[in-house]
């Protein structure tokens, strides 16, 4: 168990050392590309002159690179934006002159209409149409026609409008009084039918019975016409004697 742990630790440290070496090599190459190392304070004149010449060469290279880049960009832009020149085509063989003439006429007519509309607005709507056409010809003066005078209709002031069918049959209505609340004809009810039947029965009963209005008059009539007396004797007594 101890051996694999030691191997894994060794591998880990070996990988870390490799990474450090790579980082150091990359930083050194970047420093070389930036330019020559700056000499120390105690350097000789020859080392200083070599440092200055190397720095000047680096500046010239950067300038030349910068000067070349805009030319390349301009060339690329010219390649991308190419002007398209349309070729002129001869349409004389297609006989399009008639179409062009008709279009010109329509344009002229539209311009005339716009001018006439402006004149009409300025004149307050009473401008005359100056364009030529059959609708602008002045009509010939016709002979004056004798106007037939019609009899004026009588003017009715006030009143209520009535249709012609109702005008002929006009009936005068009598003034009506207030409605009778207790009348069965104007205000019918379910009880009215029952009362009607009772009134018929009362009339039939009146025919059989006499109505006494005066006391003395009824007694006088009874004295004049005496009622027949009933026979109280036994009619079968004769049979008993035999």
UniProtKB/Swiss-Prot annotation:
Belongs to the CDV3 family. It is found in: Cytoplasm. Residues 129-143, 183-194 have a biased composition (Polar residues). The modification N-acetylalanine is found at residue 2. The gene is cdv3-b. This is Protein CDV3 homolog B. Keywords: Acetylation, Cytoplasm. Residues 30-57 have a biased composition (Low complexity). Residues 105-122 have a biased composition (Acidic residues). Residues 1-15, 59-75, 195-213 have a biased composition (Basic and acidic residues). It comes from the Eukaryota.
């Amino acid at each position: 168990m101890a051996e694999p742990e030691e191997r894994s630790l060794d591998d880990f440290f070996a990988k870390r050392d490799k990474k450090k070496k790579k980082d150091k090599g990359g930083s050194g190459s970047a420093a070389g590309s930036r330019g020559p190392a700056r000499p120390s304070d105690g350097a000789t004149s020859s080392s200083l002159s070599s440092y200055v010449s190397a720095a000047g060469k680096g500046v010239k290279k950067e300038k030349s690179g910068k000067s070349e880049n805009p030319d390349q960009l301009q060339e690329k832009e010219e390649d991308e934006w190419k002007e398209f020149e349309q070729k002129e085509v001869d349409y004389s063989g297609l006989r399009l002159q008639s179409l062009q003439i008709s279009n010109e006429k329509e344009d002229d007519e539209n311009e005339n209409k716009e001018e006439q509309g402006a004149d009409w607005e300025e004149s307050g709507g009473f401008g005359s149409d100056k364009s030529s056409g059959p609708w602008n010809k002045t009509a010939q003066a016709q002979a004056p026609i004798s106007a037939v005078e019609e009899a004026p209709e009588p003017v009715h002031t006030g009143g209520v409008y009535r249709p012609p069918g109702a005008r002929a049959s006009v009936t005068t209505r009598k003034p009506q009084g207030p409605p009778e609340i207790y009348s069965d004809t104007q205000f019918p009810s379910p009880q009215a039918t029952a009362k009607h039947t009772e009134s018929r029965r009362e009339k039939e009963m009146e025919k059989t019975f006499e109505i006494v209005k005066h006391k003395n008059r009824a007694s006088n009539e009874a004295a004049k016409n005496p009622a027949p007396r009933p026979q109280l004797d036994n009619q079968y007594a004769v049979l008993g004697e035999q």
